[in-house]
Amino acid sequence: MKYNFDEIIDRKNAKRSYSTKWDDSARKARKYGFGETFPEDKICLQTADMDFKTAPAIIEAMKEVSEHGIYGYSAINDEYREAVCHWFSTRQNWHFNPEDIMHCNGTHPALVECIKRFTKPNEGIIVLTPSYSYHDDIENCNRIFVGVEMIEKDGYYTIDFEALEKALKNENNTLFVICHPHNPTGRVWNKEELTQMATLSRKYNVLMVSDEVHSDIIRKGITFYPMMSVVGSEGLITLTAVNKTFNLAGLSCTNIIVQDPKIKEKFNGYYSLPNPFGVAAVIAAYTESSDWVDALNEYLDETLKWCYNFINEKMPKAKCIIPEGSYVIWLDLRGYNLSDEEIKHKIINEAHLVLQGGSNFDSIYGQQFQRICIPSPRSMIQEAFERLYKVFE
């Protein structure tokens, strides 16, 4: 393979790492239930970033910025905008104009910007659950989190459109956040699902925000359809980013894509200043690193197949599916008839794994689930799953 995704890179002790995922502080140890210190042999698979070096072209571009020696106020230029348009037109057959792009320093800030501009305090924000951590963003804006529980069968999730319509019909609910691909279930919404969500949202005049930051991480044989390319731009904002695709979350480069003139008008006065490393990274990612993403997806596909087979063969009481998109496994441990606390004890105190408990995604129906982020060298993932097997079987 041209790129070495098997390389083990020290993110815990490296002088310039600054990794929150591998942070060894007492504060982080307490947060995850380890007491005051982490065990030396911990394996961290709780955060949706990768333990792989980013694409070589991106590293070289940032070296050039570093050598320039001036890191002043920066802006996204024509080259940046054209690079974004090029990527989505060639990779996802989604066409929009350079002037439809607004930069934001991160996906959470982008969502918060949308919430504050288009909703009022105490209004409801609809989210399909189990859900990625939009909860804090919504409540910190003094809005109400309105969860719509999805239907689960053998690990596969579908939308309960009857429940969704009931939520959309409530006049106090004014915004619908759609995670596509869905985190943590791994669903990639098909054209029919996207169309039905949009039709219902427009029927009840509810603005849609489609979070598509995982959209480049798609299984072989699965087609990702950008929501805006399927349903049109009316009443829809899309968020995209290089962070998940290229392991660049620390550069905080999210794009807000808006084509609807009425929505654009409400963004009048908005501005966001990127850092120069982020601008260079986005351009290099979207114009020189397509083959790296293809190789990454092949590697992740093989890792996910290995994980799925391991669970089926060695831990038959557990359930998971290979996600259609993203690089997270939503592991169902209900078959062991253990409480959520007992499951956490085994994972933390016996297996020495740092995972993310399902209750973070759904306080009721997420109990006895764990989210596992697998974009790490396969040997690390295999060791983590062997530990799970030892403590549960």
Which residue ranges define each predicted feature?
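PLP-dependent aminotransferase class I/II
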Residues: 76, 235-313, 319-323
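Conserved PLP-binding catalytic core of the aspartate aminotransferase-like
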Residues: 300-301, 314-350
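Walker B catalytic acidic pair
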Residues: 212
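Helix C-cap/helix->beta junction micro-motif
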Residues: 142, 203-204, 234, 351
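N-terminal small-domain helix-loop-helix segment of the aminotransferase-like
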Residues: 2-5, 9-106, 287-288
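PLP-dependent enzyme catalytic core of the Aspartate aminotransferase-like
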Residues: 346-354, 361-393
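Conserved core of the PLP fold type I
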Residues: 71-199, 216-217, 222-230, 237
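Conserved active-site segment immediately N-terminal to the catalytic lysine
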Residues: 221-243, 262-266, 353, 370-371
